[in-house]
Amino acid sequence: ANTILMNCAECEPLLKLHRQLLEKHAYEIMKTFHMVQETVGASEAIIGIKKSYVQTVNALKQHIEEFPGMRIHLLDEVYPMGDEVVLIYEATGRVVRPGGLPIEQGVAVFNVETLYNIYQAVEKKEPVTAKYVSVVAEVNHPVTVKVPLGCTMDDVVAQAGGTTVKDPVYFIGGPMMGRIGKGSDPVTKTTNAILVLPKDHLIVQKKMRTSAIDLKRAASICCQCNTCTDLCPRNNLGHPIDPARFMRAASNQDFRDVNPYINASFCSSCGVCE
């Protein structure tokens, strides 16, 4: 890779884990990022961060001159900026081909927590046995906590003072791309956030719907305005995915042209077209 990229663009609403971690440990993470740059022989190291994260940006600016070859790239507050394919284009102008990998464009992407874990391993000889998790929404004290890997979601929510609704549903991840979980589910290396929501919340109801219901709704509601395709982040990068054509074909069970179905495999599941 000739370019390495740090992803500090929280992809979803309500998530603050990476910006908080980077603000608190700016020097340590930047030092590790520079070490990775030297190790892989990259000529450029870019910190991609949303311009709205003012406190974190200020923390980075205090140390940026200490690391030659590293720069801060300020990003707009739009969704899904944290998608690495979108981030790569915004920060470097390079387009990852449909179904391709960033390394094909000479780019390697690291998230903030991964770099902090590298710092812990290299500088302190500590293995990864814990995870930072944000607990938000219907809890008494929204908080980001460090918890052991393998502990239950109930254990984590308890660190936020418990829930404020009678029948809570644990939504693992962000509101756009997350999934419904159980209180007994373990924290894993990919657990970034727990949203506690009432069971009648729109987001919960949407996740519980079947694809058959979604297709019937699309067939009855779609007015062929093409806005879903106009907003599709992958389509805007030139990828062949076309949500409008796919929904039109699927809702009418039209299989004469299979390309809309094949190209749907390039979907990033961001949910913008919903």
Regions found by a protein language model. Give the residues of each.
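Hydrophobic alpha-helical scaffolding
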Residues: 50, 104-108, 142-147, 218-223, ...
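Generic structural signal for well-ordered, non-membrane alpha-helical segments
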Residues: 22, 26-29, 53, 57, ...
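Hydrophobic alpha-helical positions that pack around
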Residues: 41-153, 159-166, 174
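Generic secondary-structure signature for well-ordered alpha-helical cores
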Residues: 9-10, 27, 34-42, 62-69, ...
